[in-house]
Amino acid sequence: MPRRRIVTKRNILPDPRFGSDLLAKFINILMLNGKKSTAESIVYSALDSLFRRSNKNCLEAFEIALNNVRPVVEVKSRRVGGSTYQVPVEVRLVRRNTLAMRWIIEAARKRNDKSMELRLASELLDAIEGKGHAVKKREEIHRIAESNKAFAHYRW
């Protein structure tokens, strides 16, 4: 039980172009130093580039990419009797989305393409096809959770 008041979730307004809450959250995570218009232009041009490459609806393609990166389980450290165990825990939906978005953006920033628009479009395309660094990160997390399945009874 928290000693202070419980912080309420802030409502995020849907993005202006597609009216999607998920895309608005993605733009907010991508944003650096409060430059939201720059983040919006990067995301929208990346989605346009993705549309030209894959011939799918921008929003559908984005949601497919996000779905392929969402983790189902993750591990949390739990200290029991002097030793620390990596306990596999199911991930809530909001955290799944946030982690997937974070991993896609992180993987896009590590790429070596010319502009962030191209890097983001390439990473989203790879995520749709089930490859890329963000998908590898998810597979790695799932593998760690699978190997620590024996400690699942330590969940709280």
Swiss-Prot record:
One protein family per Pfam: Ribosomal_S7
CDD domains xrefs: uS7_Bacteria
GO cellular component: a single term: small ribosomal subunit
Gene3D superfamilies tied to this protein: Ribosomal protein S7 domain (1.10.455.10)
Superkingdom of origin: Bacteria
Keywords recorded for this protein, A-Z: Ribonucleoprotein, Ribosomal protein, RNA-binding, rRNA-binding, tRNA-binding
Single annotated GO MF: rRNA binding
Assigned protein family: Belongs to the universal ribosomal protein uS7 family.
SUBUNIT field: Part of the 30S ribosomal subunit. Contacts proteins S9 and S11.
This protein's name: Small ribosomal subunit protein uS7
Lineage: Bacteria, Pseudomonadati, Pseudomonadota, Gammaproteobacteria, Enterobacterales
